[in-house]
């Protein structure tokens, strides 16, 4: 087998050839803050995915922080219907308070879990399902005491969580206590993923997408928060920019004349990033389709290899395959071998629970312990050509 001279990267930034000019137009316009381009980008995203209650932010992490904040204990002046009709609540919803627990997976980027502690909440780790690397739903159900107020679930690699099973688990909880924990879906890997035929963001939960540099679509940096309810959406728009209502409503100066009823954050996207995001989003279908095509090729041709285990696939779970993960028995030698083949591979994310700042939340996670040393992701993105993906398969088949 002839080695490829150029290294096949695990990640690569996609930038539309028109993005530079569009960003330049904004830079030359004299207005580069949150404005018309942000509004246009949100409409573009909302129309495509079928949920117009989408809010752009400056990062996916900010979107998760905002979602948790929006679920905090209602203030007396809030509309009493703010949580009505939303899948995770009933009229008994108590709201999140400082010190409450959030169930979360440690197998993810730290950007998923740090917003939990930043909101003065406690993390309760849920073990992983080694067949998908998503949260183990049996363990989730075991770890839902009354003080659990939210679940932060990650769609690993873009492969959707079983949202129906999570709904059933939460329904049992609601039967006991009259309300159920909120579900926040971390879709940083899952831009364009579908569950049971519907894009993520349409299952009546908060959902975050990341627009960070190496994701399917980038705005240089940024995030999206899909909201499940009109009033939560309106609050999200306010709180991403200090709580200031940007709608003039007859005022001559909205900054100085508007009363701030609820303090907020500096989480907004600017028009430069939005302009870049819009240009890149025009290529979304082609890019995500290529990720899926390469993944399907691997699914077919990486079967029955000694020491290599493929992850589970189920009908109705349509991954956007930001990464393609598999389990390798002797990972150290696999890493070295793939490096010699000029193929970049990685675990991608370290388990969050072993960081020293997480010491107070330590617990036993047997599935993760057995699996973490085997997790490897191989190049699957839009940049991987037919020739390269064949080469990757050939190399893996000749390992050992």
Placement of each model-derived feature along the sequence:
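Conserved PLP-binding active-site segment in aminotransferase class I/II-type PLP enzymes
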Residues: 1-88, 95-97, 166, 296, ...
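PLP-dependent aminotransferase class I/II
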Residues: 38-44, 48-54, 138, 150-154, ...
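Structural detector of well-ordered beta-strand residues that form the stable sheet scaffold
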Residues: 55, 103, 124, 182-184, ...
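Conserved SAM-binding loop
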Residues: 56, 104, 125, 225, ...
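Buried hydrophobic packing segments
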Residues: 63-71, 116, 223, 277
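PLP-dependent aminotransferase-like
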Residues: 74-187, 194
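Conserved active-site segment immediately N-terminal to the catalytic lysine
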Residues: 179-219, 248, 256-261
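Short beta-strand-to-turn element immediately C-terminal to the catalytic PLP-Schiff-base lysine
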Residues: 209-210, 223-228, 278
